[in-house]
Amino acid sequence: MTEGEGRIQLEPSWKARVGDWLLRPQMRELSAFLRQRKAAGARVFPPGPQIFAAFDATPFEQVKVVILGQDPYHGEGQAHGLCFSVLPGVPVPPSLLNIYKEIQDDLGIARPDHGYLMPWARQGVLLLNAVLTVEQGRAGAHQNKGWEGFTDHVVETLNREREGLVFLLWGSYAQSKGKVIDQTRHRVLKAPHPSPLSAHRGFLGCQHFSKTNDHLRRRGLSPIDWSLPPRSALDLTSAGA
């Protein structure tokens, strides 16, 4: 996906640091692949302007926490560019329900009535999928097409140019992608994936949300407010909405 294509633009602070990667041959090949799939009638999610929504919502210097996902939701109207998040009005996916359960158990915060995580992103939580597109009804359809190299570069750049970030690595895929992170410079918290298949193996009870805030406070930074406003009070003017 070339950065200048159509309406798709990378947020300026990210463009300055990782935009060069979008000019590489493998990204031109990815862009051609996406055009071919759309021409063949495939429905690609999220919509083009939302592919880079995670970067729009959380500029480079504002990142405090990184949550790594795998690839976007593949159901109608679900994916909007932030990992684990869905737009208001879309049923909350099972993995996110388990995230909410852990937040409630960890911090006493009641489960919200939606799955829209933009308020976290605005506070500095980069909600980054390893693969930024998918096709309707075909989980993982765009894996190994070029996105992973770009998002690896994003993680490597954060690791190198920032200090004291918290990386939340849930599941073996995220943990493998996070192997490059220097744990003497950053806090890395690992747990099984919040999927119903694995959450009971250690995600539930991991206390990652309170541990994240403890780390931020120790560094003199404001903690993340993991609570979410009710759906009726959401601000839907930002990227991805």
Swiss-Prot record:
Gene, per the UniProt record: ung
Family stated for the protein in its record: Belongs to the uracil-DNA glycosylase (UDG) superfamily. UNG family.
Function, in words: Excises uracil residues from the DNA which can arise as a result of misincorporation of dUMP residues by DNA polymerase or due to deamination of cytosine.
GO molecular function: uracil DNA N-glycosylase activity
EC number: 3.2.2.27
Enzymatic class: hydrolase
Residues the record marks as active site: D71
Keywords of the record: Cytoplasm, DNA damage, DNA repair, Hydrolase
SUPFAM superfamilies associated with the record: Uracil-DNA glycosylase-like (SSF52141)
One Pfam family in the UniProt entry: UDG
Classification of source organism: Bacteria, Pseudomonadati, Pseudomonadota, Gammaproteobacteria, Lysobacterales
SMART domains xref list: UDG, UreE_C
Main localization (coarse): cytoplasm
InterPro entries: UDG_fam1, Ura-DNA_Glyclase_AS, Uracil-DNA_glycosylase-like, Uracil-DNA_glycosylase-like_sf
Protein's name according to its UniProt entry: Uracil-DNA glycosylase
Alphabetized PANTHER family for the sequence: URACIL-DNA GLYCOSYLASE
Entry's localization field: Cytoplasm
